[in-house]
């Protein structure tokens, strides 16, 4: 899915291959994501990409001229933010906006002091275990339904 949060344009390029005529890379720490054109304009608005933001080439070329490296980009999800597509079990190796939100919550509760980078590594797992133990949950190190609930993450209906 498309990463959710505040990012920065870190690279600009005029490509022309499968990414359309222009590319603007976002500072997403867990992967390569960007805003770009497309050679398949009929795919815009559908779930066709790996999380990038696709635009018609004529529009991305216009935006490309306005945007400088360092420009902030704020990507907003639905009412459930990074959990728009549901609460999925998270384990070591998971990556994404949902992991970033877990890291923020654990940090806010005093269990995590590592980077808020959306990468579920060893330190995130250890923080989850400590949080689970402190709240009487099974200390599996995986974020499950009960852990989401104790972290205050409950989806709207």
Describe each region flagged by the PLM.
Residues 38, 45-47, 85-88:
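Short acidic, glycine/proline-rich loop/turn micro-motifs
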Residues 61-105, 129:
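N-terminal targeting pre-sequences for secretion and organelle import
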